[in-house]
Amino acid sequence: MKLSDFDFDLPSELIAQYPSSERDNSDLLIAVTPPIKTKFYNIIDYLKEGDLLVFNNSKVIKAKLNLGKNITINLNQKLSDDNWSAFAKPARKLHVNDEFYFDNHKVIITEKLAMGEIKVKFELNDISVFEFLNKYGEMPLPVYIRRSHSLCHPVATTTGSKTYLNNDWIPWSNHGMTNTQNDNDRYQTVYSQIEGSVAAPTAGLHFTKDILDKLKAEGIQATFLTLHVGAGTFLPVKTENIHEHKMHTEYCSITPDTAEIINKAKQEGKRIIAVGTTTLRTLESSCNNGIVKAGSFKTDIFITPGFKFQTADMLLTNFHFPKSTLFMLICAFAGFKEMHELYKYAIKEAMRFFSYGDATLLCRK
């Protein structure tokens, strides 16, 4: 199939710039004929006793670092305890061995790669990288979230290749994205546990603790796996032949207990509902002859129409970009024609798209 087969017209005003007033107050589109538009807090009406919801419990880290001099980096993947890959903007301003100081902590540019990718090393004093990021980093909101507030950046003093940053913050001269305290809460699922994602597994953002408690009370099970979402999730497909596209790799983990719960539910004929495309990709990557295997691994699975699914019966997901690998995935899962028609309906109904947008519940075709 061609990349253009997965294109559709999306009005820019439907790209959600902020979360809904409450997590569960977003809209939910049930993919039946005709589609049913409801509120997310009604999701329990479309599930039944014995269903198994599989969640991604990865926690978003504050992966965006302002280096001063109008330079930002977004961490991508952990390479070792102190070394990470990242994307820099603008990368042309950075050089190998540049050093950036945050109080008595240091970030060093160790390598420059193609397409703005770099490698960095953290030299920190008695704190972990995650503790450092919690203090100095920002939530890595997607690039399509563009707000009209002024950004802030730390005051920077440069001596040679060394830049010193302190906690006196001044506004950027330009306008663009900004993070708010609300984003620190709302761009994180309520059940997130394991730090490592640089983008949110967004289907889970709609769940509240109250909804999770109600699902449990109705006999609807829940279990958790981990996929650390990388920055590559936002990379566009640039080849017209979609099979020439190279997927990014991401770290996944399924515990023996989770694998046992999923396999038991499948054997008993219970419905498996994947909460998010990250969960579905992890399940399908781990599955062999219909059996989900426990373990930790990296996946670059690319799911397109024609893929034979072995795990989930239903998929809860947000609305995705035209021509994206995730729109290809849902076309594979719930039908190419059906998804184009469903998205036309969603656009007509002015549903909100992407990370802070609305959700849809799909059945496997």
From Swiss-Prot:
Protein name: S-adenosylmethionine:tRNA ribosyltransferase-isomerase
Enzyme class, spelled out: transferase
Subcellular location: Cytoplasm
Sorted UniProt keywords: Cytoplasm, Queuosine biosynthesis, S-adenosyl-L-methionine, Transferase
Major localization listed first in the record, in broad terms: cytoplasm
Membrane-crossing residue ranges in chain numbering: none
Subunit structure: Monomer.
EC number: 2.4.99.17
Record InterPro entries: QueA, QueA_dom1, QueA_dom2, QueA_sf
Name of the coding gene: queA
UniProt family annotation: Belongs to the QueA family.
One of the record's GO molecular function terms: S-adenosylmethionine:tRNA ribosyltransferase-isomerase activity
HAMAP family per record: QueA
Functional pathway: tRNA modification; tRNA-queuosine biosynthesis
SUPFAM superfamilies to which the protein is assigned, alphabetical: QueA-like
Purpose of the protein: Transfers and isomerizes the ribose moiety from AdoMet to the 7-aminomethyl group of 7-deazaguanine (preQ1-tRNA) to give epoxyqueuosine (oQ-tRNA).
